[in-house]
């Protein structure tokens, strides 16, 4: 039995079923960032309205230096520990570029990204827009990785702004240490 998404329910809850100020009033995203779940992100992660900072590293700036896809890895947090770092665990964030947004065969919104995420444990429900502030309501989308002319793969579901467009950046947290060769499309 599948779960019902926020968009299918027609209410203002996010993908996780949580109602936040920014999901009720998306215009607030201009002044306050969407909340994130700290245990799903690396240690010392905090959001801004248009970026995510991890241990002092701006993911938007990382993209300027490295292009996409790019990866940032740091210590993971112990779930339920109020931000206590895990001694022997890592967490990563993969930053990708949206290569296209279109309607799928069943009418669902499909987002194509410039990375292959089949070899990583992506936490799709925490995916965030980087580089710009969107005041559009969030809707569930199917995210497909690896669309480099081959068959798209790494299907995930993420709650993303309705005005998502080609060229937008997405930050996707992942469990464990992710290497760039794990997510880069083969040439």
Give residue spans per PLM region:
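A charged N-terminal "starter" segment
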Residues: 2-89, 160-170, 176-187
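Charged (often Lys/Glu-rich) extended helix/loop segments that serve as interaction or gating elements
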Residues: 21, 57-58, 63, 83-187
């Amino acid at each position: 039995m599948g779960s019902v998404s926020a968009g299918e329910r027609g209410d203002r809850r996010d993908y996780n079923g949580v109602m936040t100020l920014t999901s009720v009033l998306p215009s607030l995203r201009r002044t306050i960032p969407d909340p994130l779940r700290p245990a799903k992100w690396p240690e010392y992660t905090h959001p801004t309205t248009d970026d995510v900072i991890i241990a002092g590293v701006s993911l938007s700036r990382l993209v300027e230096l490295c292009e996409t896809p790019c990866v940032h890895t740091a210590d993971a947090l112990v779930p339920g520990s109020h931000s206590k770092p895990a001694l022997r665990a890592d967490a990563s964030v993969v930053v990708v570029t949206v290569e296209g947004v279109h309607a799928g065969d069943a009418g669902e919104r499909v987002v194509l990204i410039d990375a292959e995420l089949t070899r990583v444990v992506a936490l799709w429900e925490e995916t965030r827009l980087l580089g710009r502030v969107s005041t559009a309501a969030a809707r569930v989308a199917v995210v497909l990785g690896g669309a480099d002319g081959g068959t798209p793969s790494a299907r995930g579901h993420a709650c993303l702004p309705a005005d998502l467009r080609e060229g937008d950046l997405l930050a996707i947290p992942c469990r464990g240490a992710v290497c760039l060769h794990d997510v880069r499309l083969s040439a």
